[in-house]
Amino acid sequence: MEMTSAFTLNVRLDNIAIITIDVPGEKMNTLKAEFASQVRAIIKQLRENKELRGVVFVSAKPDNFIAGADINMIGNCKTAQEAEALARQGQQLMAEIHALPIPVIAAIHGACLGGGLELALACHGRVCTDDPKTVLGLPEVQLGLLPGSGGTQRLPRLIGVSTALEMILTGKQLRAKQALKLGLVDDVVPHSILLEAAVELAKKDRPSSRPLPVRERILAGPLGRALLFKMVGKKTEHKTQGNYPATERILEVVETGLAQGTSSGYDAEARAFGELAMTPQSQALRSIFFASTEVKKDPGSDAPPAPLNSVGILGGGLMGGGIAYVTACKAGIPVRIKDINPQGINHALKYSWDQLEGKVRRRHLKASERDKQLALISGTTDYRGFAHRDLIIEAVFENLELKQQMVAEVEQNCAAHTIFASNTSSLPIGDIAAHATRPEQVIGLHFFSPVEKMPLVEIIPHAGTSAQTIATTVKLAKKQGKTPIVVRDKAGFYVNRILAPYINEAIRMLTEGERVAHIDAALVKFGFPVGPIQLLDEVGIDTGTKIIPVLEAAYGERFSAPANVVSSILNDDRKGRKNGRGFYLYGQKGRKSKKQVDPAIYPLIGAQGQGRLSAPQVAERCVMLMLNEAVRCVDEQVIRSVRDGDIGAVFGIGFPPFLGGPFRYIDSLGAGEVVAIMQRLATQYGSRFTPCERLVEMGARGESFWKTTATDLQ
């Protein structure tokens, strides 16, 4: 075989063929269309060698088997027919692997996803390592697609239809022990003996498929199947609100294969794959995938980052505890927490303990590994142990004088090279750095709550922040598992600035008589994970509204909240979920009780009359203000590019991923159409809906953001 081949064949002395997967020049193995000829050439050699006893597929990469198919292949398809042909090519290749007359085993270490799992499913047996890096799944639904190389047909027959549907519909990834329990793999072994274990399995007859559990056998029959697909269909429709066509097609294709046989199933799979590849939802989801990949590669500045050997955190509250957890347990960097109250340190340590202990209980982590990670976190009530910290993250109250004091203390007690990163959500970084002796080492690092779950961070340099400080902070965020966007030091930064008018409009509609549940349901139907009122309750009404006066002072009355509404709510001791009462009432702590709207909220805020708006009208008012503000952020270079703007909105506030972010959504509607909608709303509801100048100009010229914009902050 050629040296540049991604698949190479070697035959051992015991007549076991080893096919090594190693895509040249890439960290991850991904399947490309041009590899088909390489695999077919190997299959031909295997068929011609009558001495062979078995075959093993193994990866040469240190941490992945095959991470999936190369998504660029789909983008290169111009029609549904071309994408369908791509799927049929994949199906045929997998069928040829499966048709080999000798046992074929997949030796899996690391990520085995998408097309990688489909290749493993085409093998007659699978062995995987017990390493935490080893995960198996079919995540195509997250790109608005379905598995196109036989996965929708082979997986249900191997592990049962209900379990397979859960995996395919959600993109759920299984760890090794889960995969073994479900029958997805035949054995789990240490990495050091993976190849030998796979070879031993290949020397035996083809592994016989293990009998499915009784429940799965019942569900595979006509009556059980009809009941299952009806129930799963309802549940899926409720979860997706009909916004993700891939889920409907997955159900259709899996059911076709079970009811009409694999031949019909494969045919339906290929056709559905081709059609889904051309949907705007899949195109938007793939754009988010590519954009997030680019952001993760972006170093933030041209300067080399400084070393990061240890980090300090000021404040042991909820944010401080979460930041300590991702720094120690995700980034693997030693962390020291300073809090004036020993109880604060204990809370922060308990935060990490709870996260890690949950992983131990779910068998995702060994107790010894938990203890090793916890040992990276320590605490103090003074600055002992801070002298040589490379970066300090401040997570204290939103008070400018306090944060300036923290800067002074860090400069006095830490090394000359130490970076000071403030987790402020609203205060200008330039003001925090105003009295610093080393202002070039002061930067904003805005996490979102809950820290361990929210993927986005905003990195905010002020005018005097050095390029190396930016690069080092970006480096830390990536190590913490975050997707960082660099934003300009202007009031509200980016995410809170586009979120505030969206929340304000929801509150304004409440005062006009719209119901809480109706507003929230309208935005969930639009595609947000939760509605704006529920979001405010979850964040904390006191916390979430604190930024409104800051934004109003900076940008004028378009950011003003309805008069006295917020103060009335806060004066009634309503903070949201954290104290059990906000717009909603919550059950006892520790119980998963249903929240319900508190009817007392309406007289409290002076709501009058009955709501008259439809769900689309409610969503339109909230979303249009968000879009308008996002365009202003591009115009003012608050964000470096529309790419960052889309990623920030999707990862920071849950803007519907299937729409691709605010800028792709504007492009899909057309800037001219957005301007027309906003002008109509301005006539009906006031000047806050006046479209910004940039949007009007683009509408007049018929321009779109993703084709014309490439702004960069200097």
UniProtKB/Swiss-Prot annotation:
Q: Does the keyword Lipid metabolism apply?
A: yes
Region spans: Enoyl-CoA hydratase: 1-190
UniProt cross-references to InterPro entries, sorted A to Z = 3-OHacyl-CoA_DH_CS, 3-OHacyl-CoA_DH_NAD-bd, 3HC_DH_C, 6-PGluconate_DH-like_C_sf, ClpP/crotonase-like_dom_sf, Enoyl-CoA_hydra/iso, FA_oxidation_alpha_subunit, FadJ
Which Gene3D superfamilies does the record match to this protein? 1.10.1040.50, 2-enoyl-CoA Hydratase, Chain A, domain 1, NAD(P)-binding Rossmann-like Domain
| Catalytic activity, EC | 4.2.1.17, 5.1.2.3, 1.1.1.35
Q: Which GO terms describe its biological process?
A: fatty acid beta-oxidation
Broad class of the protein's primary localization: cytoplasm
Subunit structure and binding partners? Heterotetramer of two alpha chains (FadJ) and two beta chains (FadI).
Which family does this protein fall into? In the N-terminal section; belongs to the enoyl-CoA hydratase/isomerase family. In the central section; belongs to the 3-hydroxyacyl-CoA dehydrogenase family.
Job description of the protein: Catalyzes the formation of a hydroxyacyl-CoA by addition of water on enoyl-CoA. Also exhibits 3-hydroxyacyl-CoA epimerase and 3-hydroxyacyl-CoA dehydrogenase activities.
In its UniProt entry, what is this protein called?
A: Fatty acid oxidation complex subunit alpha
